Amino acid sequence: MDIVKVCPELHIVMDVDSGLIAEMRKDILVVDLHPVEDEINKLAQYAKALENSLDPRNTPMKAYAGREGTYKLAGMFQGMFFGFWVTMAVLVLVTILAVKMNLSLIGL
């Protein structure tokens, strides 16, 4: 919102965007909201990228070309990783229980 002083002695100004000519008053504060609007648009873009990240078919916001399926691959490897460690923990517990039940397995 740009303002041009048409007649500073009479306090008359013109809004450049709309072409409206009006009297300038001391009790009214004029604030430019374009920087705020730019920040809101940037936040909306980040929110859209976060929403798109929930669908594994979409690519990340600032990814290089050819990165389709990145989230799908990451989800698969995450499941394999945690599945491996849960299986190992269960295997250790079963081994400990088997040894406690039958001490002859370790030579005692």
UniProtKB/Swiss-Prot annotation:
Membrane topology: Single-pass membrane protein
Pathway membership: One-carbon metabolism; methanogenesis from CO(2); methyl-coenzyme M from 5,10-methylene-5,6,7,8-tetrahydromethanopterin: step 2/2
Reactions catalysed, as given in the entry: 5-methyl-5,6,7,8-tetrahydromethanopterin + coenzyme M + 2 Na(+)(in) = 5,6,7,8-tetrahydromethanopterin + methyl-coenzyme M + 2 Na(+)(out)
Compartment(s): Cell membrane
Keyword Coiled coil in annotation: no
Main location: membrane
EC number: 7.2.1.4
Membrane-spanning intervals of the chain: 77-99
Keyword Ribosomal protein: no
GO terms classed as biological process: methanogenesis, from carbon dioxide; methylation; one-carbon metabolic process
InterPro entries found in the cross-reference section: MtrB_MeTrfase
Alphabetically ordered keywords of this record: Cell membrane, Membrane, Methanogenesis, Methyltransferase, One-carbon metabolism, Transferase, Translocase, Transmembrane, Transmembrane helix
CC annotations in GO: plasma membrane
GO molecular function, one term: tetrahydromethanopterin S-methyltransferase activity
Top-rank EC class of the record's enzyme: translocase
Function: Part of a complex that catalyzes the formation of methyl-coenzyme M and tetrahydromethanopterin from coenzyme M and methyl-tetrahydromethanopterin. This is an energy-conserving, sodium-ion translocating step.
Subunit-level organization: The complex is composed of 8 subunits; MtrA, MtrB, MtrC, MtrD, MtrE, MtrF, MtrG and MtrH.
Family under the similarity heading: Belongs to the MtrB family.
Protein name stated in the entry: Tetrahydromethanopterin S-methyltransferase subunit B
Species this protein is from: Methanococcus maripaludis (strain DSM 14266 / JCM 13030 / NBRC 101832 / S2 / LL)
